[in-house]
Amino acid sequence: MGDRSEQYGDIPPISSQHRMHGYGNNGEPAAMPGDGQQNWGSGPGIAHTHSMRTASTATPGMDNLGPSAVGGGISGIALGVANTHDRQSGIDAFRDADATLGYIPAERGYHTTGADNPYVPSPPSVGPGPDESSEGLRSHETFGSSAALSAAGAPAGNWTPPSGSRHSFLDGSYQGVASGPYQRHSAYSSQDYPADINPDDILDDGDDGFAAAPSNKPNAAGGAATGGAAGGLLGEFFGAKKAADASYDPVPGAGLPSVEKYAKPRPSGASRKRGWIIGGILAFIVIGAIVGGAVGGTLGNRRSETASESSEVSADDDTETNGDLDKNSDEIKSLMAMEGLHKVFPGMDYTPWGVQHPECDKWPPSQNNVTRDMAVLSRLTNTVRLYGTDCNQTEMVLHAIDRLELTDMKLWLGVWIDTNTTTNERQLSQLYDILDKRSDHSVFKGAIIGNEALYRAGSTKEEARKNIIDYMRQVRKHFNDHNIDIKVATSDLGDNWDETLADATDVVMSNVHPFFGGVEVSKAAGWTWSFWNSHNAPLTQGTNKGNIIAEVGWPSGGGNDCGDGANCKDDTSGAVAGVKQMNQFMADWVCPALENGTDYFWFEAFDEPWKVKFNKGDEQWEDKWGLMDPGRNLKPGIEIPDCGGKTAA
């Protein structure tokens, strides 16, 4: 992943003499008339509430009135605003900038200029002056299935599958933070998790994110001690033989001597009878204690499992108990009837729980959990994106789509690519196997080969670019040879895209996160649109290539980011994580994007509590990007816009 602090200096400062069009002398956006309404999209006078910010400026880098403009061209903007602003197109838009197209400021600090923005941008002021470092506006860590959003995160593969909580597959309660990625009613047993995994020993896909497993067994040491002591007593009374100097380590400080040390001549007559009586009494007491402990432990477990089927329930147990869930299952019907969900997202990023290799070989993920997830996701979107192929995750998603009869659901396949060629070859082989076995590929929108591989490459970015391009060419050749007609793409930070990478992909897929730019939420939607249109849209103009925002979202809590982490002057500066802020970003972004046809994936549907391990100091947002908690419950206070009943295609 690399130390993110070394990655944040990729944003050149904006020279003071280059005041951007549409901004006042103080660098603030020129305010637009009107106090609460703005015409959006192609329809006449689509009114929005005051939450849709009215301070409007223009998007950079292209002519949004053109037919090839991302987001619908003339139909995707407010015409009244567009006709009052001078615009430059293409490369001309950057002629007076500090740098060429390849070096324009990154998404973390771009002051916009040029044409119009349906999201009413108001980009943040760049912290550093012309002669200062631009470290304050930074890139973010990869969001792929298990990567942390903070540099505090341990390397992939460093965590082991943890214990699950004691909640039912049927209840919606939040399970423990140490319960792994997407620990929504985990079917994994905590009893067998390894205590330690060396990431260097794992042929991994970079997706490991398991936290160490705390023991769920109450009084485990005490129970073992009782068993050891009881075993010793019963062995003595029933003549068991033991090796000399045997140690009963569960007993604190117990290096007990061997039974032979206490051996005595066999008693005769009354002494023997008395010994048997005493022995019987003691044996009865010991056996009673053992049975009582076992019953108590069972009842204690059952008490916790009355409200839950805890982590003791395996994936097979789940299927045996609940069957292979489908659209007619009561539990699925309940999930799909959840209030507050609206299908307004063009796409959703998703990683099933427990699809880390090689852990999944021992603790397979639950098909029913994936089916539950897909039931909820089907209420939010018709397109789901995966990040890898390990652990049958793709097959499970496809099975869930079939069981739920989601005829409109489409899937972007994911292939995890890193510096481990064994991982890469395994992932690609699984991709080919999935597609070669199917004659009907209509459910697939494409295959994404790698996520933020360039960002994670650090100083070897150019080599990583060549490798990603080579992998995409390999995949495309296999598809052509096997008559597989789906798109081949990769995804990376918006500021890592250039013409070379764009030429090799069928779709430019950029991850754009205003939160990590320290952008105030009231300006975040416009800033996102402006960045995307300046950095990524020009790369596909005049071509038939697609252009998608592969990740965009906002955390529901955990602090605030001022462009260089949590180093803010107070807790209200910069990008503030919170339910209120998430709601505002959705209000400003979701419906206008739906109206003008902006294609994007929301990050993400469900919280990932295992990422709490990556939180540090005042940066406590790693595990809080979901619209819902890990139990598939809409977070209290979260309001997904209904966009007047309009739904995503």
Curated annotation (Swiss-Prot):
Location in or out of the cell? Cell membrane
Disordered: annotated segments: 1-50, 110-224, 301-329
**Reactions that this protein is recorded to catalyse:** Hydrolysis of (1->3)-beta-D-glucosidic linkages in (1->3)-beta-D-glucans
* Comp. bias (Low complexity): 144-157
Keyword Nucleus included in the entry's annotation: no
The active site lies at 452, 551
Q: Which GO terms describe its cellular component?
A: cell surface; extracellular region; fungal-type cell wall; plasma membrane
**Stretches that traverse the bilayer:** 275-295
- The EC number on file is 3.2.1.39
Give a short account of what the protein does.
Answer: Glucanases play a role in cell expansion during growth, in cell-cell fusion during mating, and in spore release during sporulation. This enzyme may be involved in beta-glucan degradation. Active on laminarin and lichenan.
Q: Please state which protein family the record places this protein in.
A: Belongs to the glycosyl hydrolase 17 family.
Q: What is this protein called?
A: Glucan endo-1,3-beta-glucosidase btgC
